[in-house]
Amino acid sequence: MNRYQTMFKSLNQNKLGAFVPFITIGDPDPTTFIHIIDTLIQSGADALELGIPFSDPVSDGPSIQKSMERSFKSGANISSCLQLIKKIRNKYPTLPIGLLIYANLIFKNGIKNFYAHCSTLSIDSILIPDLPIEESSLFYNSAMYYQIAHIFICPTNASLDLIKKITDKGIGYIYLLSRSGITGINNTEFNKIKLNTLIYNIKQCNQKLPILQGFGIYSSEQARSSLLSGTSGIISGSCIANIIEENHPNIDLLLEKIRKFTHLMKIAMKL
């Protein structure tokens, strides 16, 4: 049983959903980043989704773009990011750790070489936001070879045919988009009818594959609504990026706000 399976099984038995924070690796600097990770985990985060900064993050809104800029300014590159993941893995051996990375960064390092390196770090999943399923075979095959879950994204306009393809190949979980566009906080209401239909169709195709909803989830009310709609939990990143932006370099205040945000999300994850 892998780490995701163990996590979801334990949460299901306790009637809980998963709170998975997203954070750009090295934001705002390597030392503070590790303090933030420790605070998230100690406050109850069930898994981590960690992003490697990229110069043209087409799927990410202003908050995550700024977090990537801060990471770059602190000297982040792929090598330093993977070293930070190694630290986290050594400290938290049973925690599911997912990686979000844009396709070009993997190409530059060589697909097989990159997945081989990730395997040595015990990375559990890799999500590539700019990679359509039709072009994913080389990445997917390397992921399968090294026993890393290739996470597929289910967009809001997914056809039943696309959902079948995703659920047939999906491992770990499915990333369900709350809405189209880019990540970030805005006042656009989620189309609950459309989301409920997507969740129903996913479960009709594969009842065993967990669904995590992301994109624009910034409140405990949204998180709660997602769970009650039938997902297995949520991924939230822009709120954390905003907390870092608004409170750094006041580390104590920054960590306290991270702690409070995580606590609220964990309360929302109780069925």
UniProtKB/Swiss-Prot annotation:
GO molecular function annotation: tryptophan synthase activity
Pfam families tied to this protein: Trp_syntA
Cysteine pairings via disulfide bonds: none
PROSITE patterns listed in its UniProt record: TRP_SYNTHASE_ALPHA
Family matches, as InterPro entries: Aldolase_TIM (IPR013785), RibuloseP-bd_barrel (IPR011060), Trp_synthase_alpha_AS (IPR018204), Trp_synthase_suA (IPR002028)
GO CC entries: cytosol
EC number per UniProt: 4.2.1.20
This protein's record includes keyword Membrane: no
Classification via Gene3D superfamilies: Aldolase class I
Active-site residue list: E49, D60
Pathway participation: Amino-acid biosynthesis; L-tryptophan biosynthesis; L-tryptophan from chorismate: step 5/5
Catalysed reaction equations from the record: (1S,2R)-1-C-(indol-3-yl)glycerol 3-phosphate + L-serine = D-glyceraldehyde 3-phosphate + L-tryptophan + H2O
Keywords: Amino-acid biosynthesis, Aromatic amino acid biosynthesis, Lyase, Tryptophan biosynthesis
Oligomeric form and interacting partners: Tetramer of two alpha and two beta chains.
Role this protein plays: The alpha subunit is responsible for the aldol cleavage of indoleglycerol phosphate to indole and glyceraldehyde 3-phosphate.
NCBIfam families: trpA (TIGR00262)
Record-stated family: Belongs to the TrpA family.
Stated name of the protein: Tryptophan synthase alpha chain
Organism: Blochmanniella floridana
This protein's encoding gene: trpA
